[in-house]
């Protein structure tokens, strides 16, 4: 759906998509590759669709993104990070790139995602709440933080060069939960970019940003 919407904007040739798999289940791995091959064959070729599976998922999501940056980051100016359950509409993707181009001091633009497509009572409460006051919250948050915004780990566009220069995460001394790998990597990466003098912004007016929320407290 994202590729189809991009094609409608006439800007699809400027985008490539990467499926960055970290699964340790061989059956899921095979299904992912089959889905990728089928989807790639169905595309017109205007948009690149690539699949990469890591056999060693060191540092989890942050390590997955680091691996992408080390392999392919030099070929791109920006990357848009998505979770498996999140998406951005085609016009929103184009607009995010436009805003990055307009201000070369911005390292990260976060598009606030609206929770969708869950049916449990817990999830429906979140979706209803976001619908009622999500825009007010995002507007107020953006007003207060200005260029000192945050990164929520997905549905954001990132300038790759400063991200690679400043966002290498250390392993904390001691034992978990206070030591070891940094799990809330997104907050730390945003702070590192700000410390290096780059802008991190929440653009509350961006529409067409979605994610699936947890269905219960355990998830």
Report each predicted region and the residues it spans:
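Internal catalytic domains of large membrane-associated glycosyltransferases
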Residues: 1-219
């Amino acid at each position: 759906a994202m590729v189809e919407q991009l094609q409608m904007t006439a800007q699809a040739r400027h985008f490539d998509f990467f499926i960055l798999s970290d699964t340790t289940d061989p059956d899921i791995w095979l299904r992912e590759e089959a889905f990728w091959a089928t989807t790639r064959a169905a595309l017109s070729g205007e948009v690149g669709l690539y699949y990469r599976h890591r056999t060693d998922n060191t540092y989890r999501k942050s390590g997955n993104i680091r691996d992408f940056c080390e392999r392919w980051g030099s070929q791109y100016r920006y990357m848009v990070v998505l979770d498996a359950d999140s998406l951005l509409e085609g016009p929103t993707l184009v607009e995010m790139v436009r805003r990055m181009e307009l201000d070369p001091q911005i390292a990260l633009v976060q598009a606030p995602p609206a929770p969708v497509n869950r049916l449990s009572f817990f999830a429906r409460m979140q979706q209803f709440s976001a619908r009622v006051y999500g825009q007010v919250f995002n507007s107020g948050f953006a007003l207060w933080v200005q260029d000192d915004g945050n990164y929520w780990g997905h549905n954001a566009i990132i300038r790759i060069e400063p991200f690679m220069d400043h966002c290498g995460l250390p392993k904390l001394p001691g034992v978990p939960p206070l030591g070891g790998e940094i799990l809330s990597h997104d907050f730390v990466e945003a702070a590192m970019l700000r410390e290096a003098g780059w802008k991190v912004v929440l653009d509350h007016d961006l529409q067409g940003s979605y994610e699936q929320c947890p269905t219960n407290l355990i998830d």
